[in-house]
């Protein structure tokens, strides 16, 4: 972890301490080795499915999937990709809720490796520092780019922001469609799942909680 940013290490350690880190076996192999090994295994899977890898349309599929896994949809497994975060001194003494709604996210169900497609609402009440609004989006995206369950994703975003901002007053809500439900199994095309994680005043103060939940309902 020595080559990682201070913020990445802080967040990783906070998640480990709370039992909320994504289950990993150990240190990641280097990026190129991961891509090579994934492509080899995907080739074998496609062969087992009797797909003709000699066909022009399929020949590069194992390599494409390997690149997609490592560089894109599972890039959040590598804390080297954690967004650069700068916490700005709260010189204006802002003490009201800051809310960002409709943060789009795509993730991957860790049970079936199919898509989770949703939106997040994130809010916090500043203490000593504030964070650039786009960084909230980037943190949501970082933790989305992993095999996930929605409940853990919601809590990971919460703890990351609490750790970076130095305050418990953070709230996160995610509303998402799970393609493991929509495209297979029950094949329910209309249901959505909502998860909410509240900290500090968002949990202890009914008025603060209701203000946040009104913001969540605003986009529904």
Swiss-Prot record:
Q: Known InterPro entries for this protein?
A: GTP-CH-I_C/QueF, GTP-CH-I_N, GTP_CycHdrlase_I, GTP_CycHdrlase_I_CS, GTP_CycHdrlase_I_dom
Pathway(s): Cofactor biosynthesis; 7,8-dihydroneopterin triphosphate biosynthesis; 7,8-dihydroneopterin triphosphate from GTP: step 1/1
* One example GO MF annotation: GTP cyclohydrolase I activity
For this protein, the record's Gene3D superfamilies field holds: 1.10.286.10, 3.30.1130.10
| Keywords tagged on the record | GTP-binding, Hydrolase, Metal-binding, Nucleotide-binding, One-carbon metabolism, Zinc
Catalytic activities: GTP + H2O = 7,8-dihydroneopterin 3'-triphosphate + formate + H(+)
Please name the GO terms of the biological process aspect recorded for this protein, alphabetically.
Answer: one-carbon metabolic process; tetrahydrobiopterin biosynthetic process; tetrahydrofolate biosynthetic process
Which enzyme type, at the first EC level? hydrolase
Example GO CC term: the record gives: cytoplasm
Instruction: Return the Pfam families for the record.
Output: GTP_cyclohydroI
* This protein's record includes keyword Metal-binding: yes
Q: Which PROSITE patterns match?
A: GTP_CYCLOHYDROL_1_1, GTP_CYCLOHYDROL_1_2
Provide the family line: Belongs to the GTP cyclohydrolase I family.
PANTHER family associated with the record: GTP CYCLOHYDROLASE 1, GTP CYCLOHYDROLASE I
- State what protein this is by name: GTP cyclohydrolase 1
According to its UniProt entry, this protein's organism is Pectobacterium atrosepticum (strain SCRI 1043 / ATCC BAA-672)
């Amino acid at each position: 972890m020595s080559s990682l940013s201070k913020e990445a290490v802080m967040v990783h350690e906070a998640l480990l301490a709370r039992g909320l880190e994504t289950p990993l076996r150990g240190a990641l192999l280097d990026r190129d080795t991961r891509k090579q090994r994934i492509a080899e295994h995907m080739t074998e899977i496609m062969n087992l499915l009797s797909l003709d890898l000699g066909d022009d349309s399929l020949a590069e599929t194992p390599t494409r999937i390997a690149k997609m896994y490592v560089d894109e949809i599972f890039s959040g497994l590598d804390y080297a990709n954690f967004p650069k975060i700068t916490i700005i001194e709260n010189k204006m003494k802002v003490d009201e809720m800051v809310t960002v709604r409709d943060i789009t996210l795509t993730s991957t169900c860790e049970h079936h490796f199919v898509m989770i497609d949703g939106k997040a609402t994130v809010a916090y009440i500043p203490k000593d520092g504030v964070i650039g609004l786009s960084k909230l989006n980037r943190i949501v995206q970082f933790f989305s780019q992993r095999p996930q369950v929605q409940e853990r994703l919601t809590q990971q975003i919460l703890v990351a922001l609490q750790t970076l901002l130095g305050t418990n007053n953070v709230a996160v809500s995610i509303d998402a469609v799970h393609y493991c439900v929509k495209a297979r199994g029950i094949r329910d095309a209309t249901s959505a799942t909502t998860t909410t994680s509240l900290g500090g005043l968002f949990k202890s103060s009914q008025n603060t909680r209701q203000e946040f939940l009104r913001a969540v309902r605003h986009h529904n």
